Regions:
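Acidic catalytic patch
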Residues: 59-80
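Short, well-structured N-terminal submotif of metal-dependent ribonuclease cores
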Residues: 1-32, 42-55, 123-124
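Alpha-helix capping/helix-boundary segments
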Residues: 9-10, 36, 70, 89-90, ...
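Short, structured coil segments at secondary-structure junctions
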Residues: 26, 57-59, 112-113
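Donor nucleotide-sugar recognition loop
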Residues: 80-86
Length: 124
């Protein structure tokens, strides 16, 4: 099953105590949105070690670009309900690419018709 990893899942997976999450990710066919690259690497307080880890992760990842279709879908989502730009673009990417969105923030996305959302912490 191909999944789209939300930014929070990428961050949690880097923490030593989340070995089960890393195993979950390895068992699926993960992709990430280009928005997650900006959200994770753009965090101003990353240590050098954290930055290196995430850069290596993204280098090895399948990164999905923000297409015109994704932009159109994100606009539609934001017109329906207040949500962050990042969440709108990530949700729209999952919708347009027909991917399961893996996130810990189910409430931020659960209202979106047709979007499949999975919280790996709830299933472990």
């Amino acid at each position: 099953m191909t999944v789209l990893l939300d930014s929070n899942i990428i961050i949690y997976a880097a923490q030593p105590e989340h070995a089960d999450l890393r195993c979950f990710i390895e068992q699926h066919d993960p992709a990430v949105s280009a928005i997650s690259v900006v959200e994770v690497l753009g965090f101003h307080r990353l240590s050098d070690d954290e930055r290196t880890h995430f850069e290596e992760f993204f280098t090895a990842s399948r990164i999905l670009a923000v297409s015109d279709l994704v932009i159109s879908e994100a606009v539609s989502l934001r017109q329906q309900r207040k949500m962050t730009l990042g969440d709108a673009l990530i949700g729209a990417t999952a919708l347009t690419d027909n991917l399961i969105l893996v996130t810990r923030n189910v409430d931020d996305f659960g209202w979106i018709a047709g979007l499949r959302v999975l919280d790996p912490f709830a299933s472990t």
